[in-house]
Every structure is written in C-alpha cells, then in structure tokens.
C-alpha cells in the first residue's frame, strides 16, 4: 500500500496504490479536503490494467526500418552520437514528472536546443504564474456564488472538480458557460459557444457579482487557438471586473510542473519543425513529421514509440518518485509503488546517464540532489502540498477572432498512453461512442 498522486487529469487527486509483487492491483482515493476530498474519478480508479500492457521494457534501435532490441550502453552511445553537433529540440509529455522535465531542459539547452511542454499550442505565458495557473484554489469553488466556465468541459477534463462544481451549484452557485453546450450533470446558463459571446460578456457591468465570491475557470481548448492569448486576457479582464478569482484548468498532470521548471521557449514549436533531432519525453499526442531523427523516452509502446529511431524505456508514474504540480499550482509527491518492468529505468536517471555520455554531466547523482538543484531555481516547489499565492499580473494581448471553442479532451477514456493501453478503457470508449451515435440517431 503506497500513498501517491493520480495523473489521469491535472487535479492531482490523492490515491492509495495497492500492489501485489510487481503489479498494481487497484487504486483507491485518499482523503484530501483541498483537492479531491474522498473522491476519485472512475478512469483513475480502473486504469491499472494499462500499466501491465504494451510496456517498453528494453531499449530499441531502428535499423533498416525495423526496431531491434539493444543494450543500455549501445542505446545511450547511439543517442549521444545522434545529438552531438545537431539542431536539437525537446518535447515534454503530459505525464512527465517535474524532475524529468527539468533534467530534459538542462540536457537539451546544454546542447544549444530548446524544450517545450505546451505541446498542444496553448498560449500560456511562461513568466506569469497568475496567467498559467491562476489565483483560485480548488476549495474556492465551494464558497463561490458565481462560476464562469470558458472553453472547458470539466466533466471530461477533471470529473472530481466537476463534482465539486455540482456541490456548489446545489448550495446556490450560479454557473455560466461560454463554449460547447455539454451535459455537466447540473444546470448552467449557456452564454454562447465562442469568442463572440466572450467579447459580449467582457462588456458587461457585473453589478451585484462584485460583492460575492466568484471564480472564472478557463479550459485548454480556449487557449490553443491563434488568439489564445487574447482569450486569456479577456478571462483575466472579466476576473478583475467581478473581483473574482481565476483558475486555469489544465488537462495534463505534468504541465504546470514543467512550466514551473522552465521547460518552455517562445519559439520552441517552430524550432521543432526545423530540428534535426527531436528528444520526445512521452509526448505521444504530437504528430512528428518525417525527417528528423527521433529519440523517444517513455513507458508505453504508443504513438511516440512508433515514430522513434531510438527508444529508451522509462518508468510509469507508479514506478518512480516524482513531483507533480496540480492545476491550482500545488506541488505533490507521487511515491514509487513498484518497479519498472525489465530494463526500464527512472526517467531522470536516463537523462543523467545521457548527460555523461554527451560529456556534459549533470551536477547530481541522485533524485535528492536533483531536487536540491531544482528547488534552488524554483523555491516554491519545496513547499509540498501548499498552494503559493501568485501575484496578479494581467495579460495584455491582441484581438479576439471569431469562432467557437472546441474540446480539450475528445475521448475521455483514451487521453494518454496508459489509458490507451488499458483493455477496459478501450471497451468504455467504444461504449461511449456507441451511446453518442445512438443519441444522434434518436434525435
């Protein structure tokens, strides 16, 4: 029995991991009033079979179009040879712990390259924590009298947060939505589906709302368009006008931690297009074009591994200690419940070994030493289980274009490599699809 953190969404629900031998047998919720109370989303509870299937358990090297097993020394030597003197870019995936994102940033920037964790193109300013995390805590929802949702479907993006919103609604909270009309299990006022409704709302006077607690929740689908920065600026403007608090609802468990660690670059996604070598740390949702040499480090044989020229097998979230910062900016520790299969290693350790192979050895030999270096750069990460107060810095950005907001999570049950490896999640996804098609046919 190991106390840990769930990574299926960015809420950071506290869980207990029960293992038998090497295998995870079940996940149970742990009580944390500030995050998930005593609840856990069904997906988080039943995704354990995905940790057993399609695992990467040894390094692979692609030769003549086919992947062949390799030893660690050979794989690391090949990786270092491929990276030396080349234009390198790094991608940080959604499930990467903060330490691994920080180590990758040091490795790639040491080779003159750039690193990016905002792989979905979200226009989140990396130097403004009040804009990429917000100022609200999850507990603030409990006391809110008004809640505005912008471009988000919390039922898919963070089901336990949605349950908390429902609890507030039952106590009299009025909820309004700008975005696609979805079933949230409670009533809300639908203001419109896109930017026009947001612009109209921005011009509102908000009389009585100013005197009572309110919260504005912004989803990732609102921030991934070309005008994502303008949408964020509008949301912050509405938050100011209502004397409310802002919560950026992330859909990736590792995103806030990676941004805190500095794994961003304003020109990174353009650099990825022109890079000769791409180091992919579990970013399976990114389509990488033919051309660049791809090194994939991750736990599952998912999309990223299929495109890779070298595969370095890493541990999953239950198989290594890791720091995850949740959507409200709360650093939490995920503890190791079991060991990675076969020859798979901890993610930070792979990057440390590769740094030595490249002749630019990191100044740490253990996870504890890495954390000391990380905390020296980002002091608030030492405050485990505390939500730092972020200084409010409004974003000044361009004009809103016209158009509707989309969905950040299109298939709830298959949103990451672990879920896609799960037979149960595949079955649930198929059932959900059949249900939605039946509803459309009935209409």
Region annotations inferred by a language model:
Residues 119-386, 438-443:
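Non-catalytic alpha/beta scaffold blocks inside enzyme catalytic domains
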Residues 34, 43, 67, 319, ...:
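Alpha-helical structural elements
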Residues 44, 58, 277, 362, ...:
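Intrinsically disordered, low-complexity segments enriched in small/polar residues
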Residues 1-205, 221, 354, 411-443:
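N-terminal export/assembly segments and adjacent metallocofactor-ligating motifs
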Residues 371-443:
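Long, low-complexity segments enriched in small/aliphatic residues
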């Amino acid at each position: 029995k190991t106390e840990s953190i769930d990574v299926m969404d960015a809420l950071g629900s506290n869980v207990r991991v029960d293992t038998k031998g090497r295998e995870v047998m079940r996940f149970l919720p742990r009580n944390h009033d500030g995050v998930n109370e005593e609840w856990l989303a069904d997906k988080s509870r039943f995704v354990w079979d995905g940790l057993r299937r399609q695992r990467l358990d040894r390094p692979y090297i692609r030769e003549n179009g086919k992947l062949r097993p390799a030893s660690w020394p050979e794989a690391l030597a090949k990786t270092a040879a491929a990276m030396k003197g080349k234009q390198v870019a790094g991608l940080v995936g959604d499930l990467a712990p903060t330490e691994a994102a920080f180590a990758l940033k040091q490795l790639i920037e040491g080779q003159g390259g750039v690193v990016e964790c905002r792989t979905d193109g979200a226009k989140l300013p990396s130097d403004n924590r009040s804009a990429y995390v917000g100022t609200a805590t999850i507990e603030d929802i409990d006391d809110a009298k008004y809640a505005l949702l912008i471009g988000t479907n919390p039922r898919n993006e963070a089901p336990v947060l949605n349950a908390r919103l429902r609890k507030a609604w039952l106590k009299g909270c009025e909820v309004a939505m700008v975005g696609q009309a979805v079933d949230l299990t409670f009533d809300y006022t639908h203001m419109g589906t896109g930017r026009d409704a947001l612009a109209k709302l921005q011009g509102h006077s908000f009389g009585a709302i100013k005197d009572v607690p309110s919260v504005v929740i912004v989803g990732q689908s609102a921030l991934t368009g070309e005008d994502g920065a303008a949408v964020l600026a509008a949301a912050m403007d509405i938050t100011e006008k209502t004397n409310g608090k802002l919560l950026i609802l992330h859909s990736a468990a590792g995103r806030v931690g990676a941004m805190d660690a500095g794994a961003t670059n304003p020109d990174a996604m353009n650099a990825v297009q022109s890079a000769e070598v791409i180091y992919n740390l579990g970013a399976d949702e990114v389509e990488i074009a033919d051309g660049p040499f791809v090194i994939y480090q991750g736990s599952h044989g998912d999309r990223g591994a299929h495109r890779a020229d070298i595969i370095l097998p890493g541990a999953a979230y239950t198989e290594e200690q890791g720091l995850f910062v949740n959507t409200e900016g709360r650093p939490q520790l995920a503890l190791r419940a079991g060991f990675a299969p076969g020859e798979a290693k901890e993610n930070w350790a792979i990057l440390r070994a590769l740094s030595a192979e490249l002749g630019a050895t990191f100044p740490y030999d253990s996870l504890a030493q890495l954390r000391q270096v990380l905390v020296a750069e980002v002091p608030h990460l030492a405050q485990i289980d505390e939500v730092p107060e972020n200084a409010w810095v409004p974003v000044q950005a361009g004009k809103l274009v016209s158009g509707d907001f989309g969905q950040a999570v299109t298939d709830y049950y298959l949103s990451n490599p672990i879920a896609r490896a799960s037979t149960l999640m595949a079955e649930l996804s198929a059932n959900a699809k059949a249900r939605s098609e039946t509803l459309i046919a009935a209409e």
